Curated annotation (Swiss-Prot):
Main localization, broad class: membrane
Family: Belongs to the ATPase alpha/beta chains family.
Enzyme class: translocase
Gene3D superfamilies linked: 2.40.10.170, Bovine Mitochondrial F1-atpase, Atp Synthase Beta Chain, Chain D, domain 3 (1.10.1140.10), P-loop containing nucleotide triphosphate hydrolases (3.40.50.300)
Keyword Disulfide bond: no
Subcellular location: Cell inner membrane
Top-level taxonomic group: Bacteria
Catalytic activity field: ATP + H2O + 4 H(+)(in) = ADP + phosphate + 5 H(+)(out)
Keyword Acyltransferase in annotation: no
Name of the protein in its database record: ATP synthase subunit beta
């Protein structure tokens, strides 16, 4: 193993000089003894003259020039397989849950090639989430990629926790959760939520949270993905949850600036599209097994045209857009049914009835949107009888798209509901056909199936 010495430290960036004939390769891991602890560095650039520029996978406090650095001769490797289930790990795959060592069956490098073209498989099977608005408007494909887009505080993490709870319990497969640059409190909540739902033994948790250096936040998504790839290559259907993919981009921006690259649009790294592509192309399903991924995407200043969310859009099969306007009406989940899309919403995949009901719901909501201006200026009385009916049904649909969540029982005080796709389609079809025109709109708010709305109406 070659050894070199530190010649410069600038924040998270460390330059190391090696003898000319033993310069480490890009992405190789180096190790330096920093006081009591060992610090891992990852090579990012070869500067010439035997000098490599590295990013620290931990705090660089206490490093000094002249310290000896060892080249490990391979990229960062993390434990994979069943030993990781029920454990919380950091970017290097080290346990941070105080439960002792992870019995390692095997270690894989976090930098791996994406599956080749002939290995890929395309599935048309639907994944039922039990959340009405998602199952109806933007159905998820098994082995597909879903993005949850939303600004600050509209419910991305709560939606994701509900999805994990519903899918992990109903789907009974393995899941991997990568917390990328999110709040440590959310990671803690998530751990306890999984413990309470008795699904912790089926989930691997990998955290690189907000307080960690950019190197950790940039690579932790790859650590989680590597663990998911191992389960997939064993022939399983695995779920990969990433919260939040925007922080992955942001960590890349920080690293890029520290490495001295010229920024591109809005200050993002010039390699934004390539970095996103390298990650997203590995999240895919092969003929052996599948990875279904759900990714939360923070939208800066609620602007979907920002380069980071815009780059993410291109890789997804379904997009769930959370809207501040809908959240302000008190309708949760605050999914915008007119802005959310799915490649699966096709009569050949979901069937003619589902397709017709979903499009019917969207067209009524769209018409209501157009009539809002007239109502604001002239009032409801100026509308034709047909339009009044459209408005009444649209408001019922809007309320029926809300649903009490299991993970939000503490906030709502009402028990969570899992609604099957069959019940969802039946309920919305009934509203569109006018079967429930006699019920008050309040009866449709925060209920599961249509029968519950009918029951609630009797009490109002």
């Amino acid at each position: 193993m070659a050894t070199g010495k530190i010649i410069q430290v600038i924040g998270a960036v460390v330059d190391v000089e090696f003898p000319q004939d033993t310069v480490p390769k890009v992405y190789d891991a180096l190790e330096v003894q920093n006081g009591e602890a060992k610090l891992v560095l990852e090579v990012q650039q070869q500067l010439g003259g035997g000098v490599v520029r590295c990013i620290a996978m931990g705090t660089s406090d206490g490093l000094s020039r002249g310290l000896s650095v060892t080249d490990l001769g391979h990229p960062i490797e993390v434990p994979v397989g069943k030993a990781t289930l029920g454990r919380i790990m950091n970017v290097l795959g080290e346990p941070i849950d105080m439960k002792g060592d992870i019995g390692e069956e095997e270690r894989w490098a976090i930098h791996r090639p994406a599956p080749s073209y002939e290995e890929l498989s395309n599935s048309q099977e639907l994944l039922e989430t039990g959340i009405k608005v998602m199952d109806l408007i933007c159905p998820f494909a098994k082995g597909g990629k879903v993005g949850l887009f939303g600004g600050a505080g509209v419910g991305k993490t709560v939606n994701m926790m509900e999805l994990i709870r519903n899918i992990a319990i109903e789907h009974s497969g393995y899941s991997v959760f990568a917390g990328v640059g999110e709040r440590t409190r959310e990671g803690n909540d998530f751990y306890h939520e999984m413990t309470d739902s008795n699904v912790l033994d089926k989930v691997s948790l990998v955290y690189g949270q907000m307080n960690e250096p950019p190197g950790n936040r940039l690579r932790v998504a790859l650590t989680g993905l590597t663990m998911a790839e191992k389960f997939r290559d064993e022939g399983r259907d695995v779920l990969l949850f990433v919260d939040n993919i925007y922080r992955y981009t942001l960590a890349g921006t920080e690293v890029s600036a520290l490495l001295g690259r010229m920024p591109s649009a809005v200050g993002y790294q010039p390699t934004l599209a390539e970095e996103m592509g390298v990650l997203q192309e590995r999240i895919t399903s092969t003929k052996t097994g599948s990875i279904t991924s759900v990714q939360a995407v923070y939208v800066p200043a609620d602007d979907l045209t920002d380069p980071s969310p815009a780059t993410t859009f291109a890789h997804l099969d379904a997009t769930v857009v959370l809207s501040r306007q809908i959240a302000s009406l008190g309708i949760y989940p605050a999914v915008d049914p007119l802005d959310s899309t799915s490649r699966q919403l096709d009569p050949l995949v979901v069937g003619q009835e589902h397709y017709n009901v979903a499009r019917g719901v969207q067209s009524i909501l769209q018409r209501y949107q157009e009539l809002k201006d007239i109502i604001a200026i002239l009032g409801m009385d100026e509308l034709s009888e047909d339009d009044k009916l459209v408005v009444a049904r649209a408001r019922k649909i809007q309320r029926f798209l809300s649903q009490p969540f299991f993970v939000a029982e503490v906030f709502t005080g009402s028990p969570g509901k899992f609604v099957s796709l069959k019940d969802t389609i039946r309920g919305f079809k009934g509203i569109l056909d006018g079967d429930y025109d006699h019920l008050p709109e309040q009866a449709f708010y925060m209920v599961g199936t249509i029968e519950e709305a009918v029951e609630k109406a009797k009490k109002l």
